[in-house]
């Protein structure tokens, strides 16, 4: 509380218990504050465990209250968080993902790779995420591979980059008879991840809790065809036919999407995703963020007179 009393203004990232306490203190001490909404607490808690399901409604309504009454809000999504947690104040969408450089040689290499793909050759699917956090959703892709195998389609390999205990996902792979099609690559330095992205064929973001996924945008910037779950900002990045639901139908939907990826489709999606990723150019995002921050700074100077 003393820290807030001594400051001129507050910038708080929600959801976060500490940030929530800070905003509460700022309101009490009549200090101007800006909120940056980076994720959905409902999704994070509801998809975690039983205790999370109990806490989810409380956290949801708490964040809804604070954002509704925030005079300045930055959202990391274009639509999702804005719809779920609207504000009466001023707002701007500024992704917390910012790509530094684009090189058209990347998309040229991707298109060449797709063109040279042989009929029935191995198709490598990839995901970067912790492998011991169940809401990351890799198990749904593994189950889909099992279903495709029963249909006679065995040319898919799923590579997982990320740290953590692999026991659960390995058990799912074994149960679905696809242990030989699932490869755990472990943690990888960021620069090596880009090299790996250039090797795989399709990227999938199957998680049930997200803000705006950096990993997916980075994959798109390498010209990768991609698909993902109907979670948070993922549908803002991909075309609707490459989104699967978070329901009991999701395994069938993943299978349908994977079967749809022929050469023509992969070429179209490679081009489309590469262009879409350019919206996350660091210079564009930083310009928008700085303009909004300057406006908040001016507002903060005169807050005592207008607050």
What are these regions (language model features)?
Residues 206-208:
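Aromatic "clamp/platform" in nucleotide-sugar-dependent glycosyltransferases that forms part
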Residues 44, 60-111:
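A short, active-site helix/loop in glycosyltransferases that binds the activated sugar's phosphate group
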Residues 170-188:
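Nucleotide-activated donor-binding/catalytic signature segment of Leloir-type glycosyltransferases, i.e.
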Residues 128-133, 156-170, 186-187:
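Glycosyltransferase donor-sugar binding loop
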Residues 111-136, 142-145:
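Conserved donor-binding/catalytic core segment of Leloir-type glycosyltransferases
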Residues 216, 225-228:
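Short hydrophobic beta-strand element within catalytic cores of glycosyltransferases
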Residues 4, 187-188, 195-200:
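Short alpha-helical donor nucleotide-sugar binding micro-motif in glycosyltransferases
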């Amino acid at each position: 509380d003393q820290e807030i009393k001594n400051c001129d203004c507050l910038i708080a990232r929600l959801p976060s218990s500490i940030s929530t306490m800070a905003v509460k203190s700022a309101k009490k001490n009549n200090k101007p504050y800006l909120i940056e909404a980076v994720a959905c607490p409902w999704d994070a808690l509801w998809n975690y465990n039983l205790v999370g399901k109990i806490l989810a409604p409380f956290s949801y309504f708490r964040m809804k209250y604070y954002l509704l009454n925030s005079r300045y809000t930055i959202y990391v999504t274009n639509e999702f968080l804005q719809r779920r947690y609207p504000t009466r104040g001023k707002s701007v969408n500024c992704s917390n993902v910012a790509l530094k450089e684009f090189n058209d040689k990347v998309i040229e290499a991707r298109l060449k790779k797709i063109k040279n793909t042989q009929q029935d050759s191995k198709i490598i699917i990839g995901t970067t995420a912790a492998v011991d956090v169940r809401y990351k959703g890799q198990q749904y892709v593994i189950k889909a591979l099992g279903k495709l195998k029963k249909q006679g389609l065995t040319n898919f390999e799923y590579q997982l980059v990320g740290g953590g205990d692999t026991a659960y996902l390995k058990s799912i792979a074994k149960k679905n008879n696809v242990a030989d099609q699932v490869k755990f690559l472990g943690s990888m330095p960021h620069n090596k991840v880009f090299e790996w992205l250039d090797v795989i064929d399709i990227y999938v973001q199957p998680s049930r809790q997200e803000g705006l996924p950096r990993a997916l945008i980075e994959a798109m910037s390498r010209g990768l065809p991609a698909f993902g779950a109907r979670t948070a900002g993922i549908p803002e990045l991909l075309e609707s036919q490459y989104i699967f639901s978070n329901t009991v139908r999701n395994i069938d939907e993943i299978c349908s999407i994977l079967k749809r990826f022929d050469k023509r489709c992969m070429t179209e999606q490679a081009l489309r995703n590469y262009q879409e990723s350019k919206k996350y150019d660091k210079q564009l995002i930083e310009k928008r963020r700085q303009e909004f921050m300057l406006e908040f700074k001016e507002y903060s100077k005169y807050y005592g007179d207008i607050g």
